[in-house]
Amino acid sequence: MIRQLIFISVFAATAAMAALAQNVTGTVTCGGAGVSGVAVSDGINVVTTDKQGRYALQTDKANGYVFISIPRGYTVDMADGFNPQFWQKLSDAKVETAEVHNFKLTYSPADDYVMIIGADSHLARRIGDRKTYKNGYIASLKYEKEKAAESQLPTYSMILGDLTWDNFWYANKYTLRNFMDDQRKMHYPVPLFPVIGNHDNDPAVPHSANTDFLAAKLWRDVVCPNYYSYNPGKVHYVVLDNIVYQNDTLPAGKKARKGVWGQRNYNAAVTEQQINWLRQDLALVDKQMPVVVCSHIPTFRINRNFSTFGSLQNYKELASCFDGFKNVHFVSGHTHVNFNAHPSEYPHIMEHNIAAICASWWITGKLTGTDMCTDGSPAGYSRWTVRGDSIEWK
């Protein structure tokens, strides 16, 4: 009897510890039925749902969210018509507090669609940028959506970083929160999967060992996780944050704009935490499936001799994550020019650097009436037509 009581006590204690360890749980369902095999993550660990659509995650809650990788054949609710609800904020920072977060999917079997890829909107409440953005980019998105609908194709979009301009967050009172509000007011017409850029980090955060994490807090609070994945059709999309924000102390005698603490400088790299998450994410992906890697700074660039070189500090480590994959596309912004690169070292990888929505920070349009990037290419975006695992771009 004593042995039985000891066994029961030990079992109960073990079960309690297990429940405490798995402090974020929930379900992923469609029409009330569980969806199995859906990747769920806190940005550090990746788990998948069981046959009943249930998941259990052990998390330190450091990132403050939980998200799913939207699976093929499904979509999620779009808040305000454009904001995909694939993530949820955690409600309590205490690790010992258990939380339940459920996700609902809608069946959407389309493997064919249009993806509009823009970059560098740089909205900052200056020189009429928001009006030009609405009359130009938003109007173009509406046109693209209508044209795609004629072929019964859904339309998605992404903006590859620098949605805002950190130098004017406080001087012009225009932060990421204002950007998201503007998209609501302008009726952004298609789902938007955003990417963080260097100008989307909070310049008021002082330089420290934790600057990069703290400077991205507003992004994580009001936009979405700064790295995640999703699966429209037969293509796997990965969004990465390749900005390691430093914001070093200003040199003596140099002054910054209102609210800006430091130099707003950064390193171009993907953190080890993201690399570890990415390897877990890709382990769930068929290597025959095309992968599109979305980030702000190009991983590969072209020099004056038209030779391709790696531009991230740890580009080799990042590229190694895609060993064995056959068809990998990197898409990026940041440069305000337009180019494609084929790194000879990685024949399965192609870089697409997309010209800026704002052209040359909205200045050429203001001065000349023509929005033109620094290489002479027009302001705009790239339109990708995806049919199954076939991708065409313009």
Where are these regions (language model features)?
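Bacterial Sec-dependent N-terminal signal peptides
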Residues: 1-22
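Extended active-site neighborhood of metal-dependent phosphoesterases/phosphodiesterases
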Residues: 72-76, 81-94, 99, 168-285, ...
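N-terminal active-site segment of His-dependent metallophosphoesterases
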Residues: 23, 30-31, 80-170
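The substrate-binding groove and active-site-proximal loops of carbohydrate-active enzymes
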Residues: 121-122, 127-133, 163-172, 260-271, ...
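Short, acidic Ser/Thr/Gly-rich low-complexity loop/linker segments typical of extracellular
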Residues: 44-60
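Short, ordered, surface-exposed loop/turn motifs in non-cytosolic proteins
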Residues: 22-24, 29-44, 61
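Active-site glycine-centered loops adjacent to acidic/histidine catalytic or metal-binding residues
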Residues: 120, 161-162, 197-198, 296, ...
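Short acidic, glycine-rich surface-loop motifs adjacent to enzyme active sites
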Residues: 282-303
